[in-house]
């Protein structure tokens, strides 16, 4: 039985966001590095650094906390992450069938033959792949 590193990454980010933690530490793999780079590029994460501890590499990510002011006071915006394709049920989509998350407001992360990319990049390159997760 294998370990789902993508689900571990998303759960760590979700838990840190809910508990108002500033940083997240996850095990570094090629897939998690590429997903974190996409989150950094899209503005969900402020910064990322690679940390070595006893022959294992970890990614230490600083989360971006946005505060908005309303009549009732200041509240934090939440980042929603949802795992779509999982080890027990893989979900694939061609470039025409790539779903738009919240009508284009969110992003879908895909694993394609040209690497891990967002739904917009996959549509521009006209390639499909495995839908890993939704982020909005």
Curated annotation (Swiss-Prot):
Claim: Disulfide bond is one of the keywords in the record: no
Biological process terms in GO annotation: translation
Name of the protein: Small ribosomal subunit protein uS8c
Cellular component aspect of the GO annotation: chloroplast; plastid; ribonucleoprotein complex; ribosome
Chain's gene name: rps8
Keywords (A to Z) from UniProt: Chloroplast, Plastid, Ribonucleoprotein, Ribosomal protein, RNA-binding, rRNA-binding
Location of this chain's protein in the cell: Plastid, Chloroplast
NCBIfam families (alphabetical): PRK00136.1
GO MF annotation list: rRNA binding; structural constituent of ribosome
PANTHER family xrefs: 40S RIBOSOMAL PROTEIN S15A (PTHR11758)
UniProt superkingdom: Eukaryota
Record note on quaternary structure: Part of the 30S ribosomal subunit.
Function summary: One of the primary rRNA binding proteins, it binds directly to 16S rRNA central domain where it helps coordinate assembly of the platform of the 30S subunit.
Protein family per UniProt: Belongs to the universal ribosomal protein uS8 family.
